[in-house]
């Protein structure tokens, strides 16, 4: 399944919830009304896009002719840009789900994170890549981690000593990030366990 846009995810979630609550899918008019579209035609365009992405089937000739091709999302969630102060896996950060077997990675991956920037390029982690992440706080010095400093999320190599943490880039053009644990909020969100080159798995 290709990643859904935020708006497509809203439409998909609405359909799934409506079926769960009423036993039948919503009409185009109901979708338009609930999501603030100007007309049922706008809802129809989103339905066609979802059909092209393989998450639902449009049954012609019926006002409620929508059939979900998967009852619930499976695969690994892809986390895009993370808003300040919010959980990494908050629903609004999830761009879609990818059919990737978590057990391909050791330890197994719990989610994918879209990489932003080139600070880790020397070990093959490029801008736009999908980083497979095992959700854990049990990490060791020298491992590549997903860390949150105050409200910023970053991918770096960990070096911790006492109350000081250094987050080391793998690109000579970048300088390490130094964190004083007595003054700054610092959380390990997970351990990097693999990379999917941008576009290869889509």
Curated annotation (Swiss-Prot):
The record marks 84-85 as: Cleavage. It catalyses: Hydrolysis of Ala-|-Gly bond in repressor LexA. GO terms for molecular function: DNA-binding transcription repressor activity; sequence-specific DNA binding; serine-type endopeptidase activity. Residues 28-48 bind DNA. Pfam families: LexA_DNA_bind (PF01726), Peptidase_S24 (PF00717). Belongs to the peptidase S24 family. This is LexA repressor. It comes from Salmonella typhimurium (strain LT2 / SGSC1412 / ATCC 700720). The lineage of its organism: Bacteria, Pseudomonadati, Pseudomonadota, Gammaproteobacteria, Enterobacterales.
């Amino acid at each position: 399944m290709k990643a859904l846009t935020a708006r497509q995810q809203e439409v998909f979630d609405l359909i799934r919830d409506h079926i769960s609550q009423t036993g039948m899918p919503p009409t185009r008019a109901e979708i338009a009304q609930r999501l603030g579209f100007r007309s049922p035609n706008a809802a129809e365009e989103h339905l066609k896009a979802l059909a092209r992405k393989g998450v639902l089937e449009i049954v012609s000739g019926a006002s409620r002719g929508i059939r979900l091709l998967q009852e619930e999302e499976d695969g690994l969630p892809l986390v895009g840009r993370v808003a300040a102060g919010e959980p990494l896996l908050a629903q609004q950060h999830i761009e879609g789900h990818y059919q990737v077997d978590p057990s391909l990675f050791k330890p197994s991956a719990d989610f994918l994170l879209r990489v932003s920037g080139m600070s880790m390029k020397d070990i093959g982690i490029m801008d736009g890549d999908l980083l497979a992440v095992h959700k854990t706080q049990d990490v060791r010095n020298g491992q590549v981690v997903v860390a949150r400093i105050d409200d910023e999320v970053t991918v770096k190599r960990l070096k911790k000593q006492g109350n000081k943490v250094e987050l080391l880039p793998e690109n000579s053009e970048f300088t390490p990030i130094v964190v004083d644990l007595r003054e700054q909020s610092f959380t390990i969100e997970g351990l990097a366990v693999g990379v999917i080159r941008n576009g290869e798995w889509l």
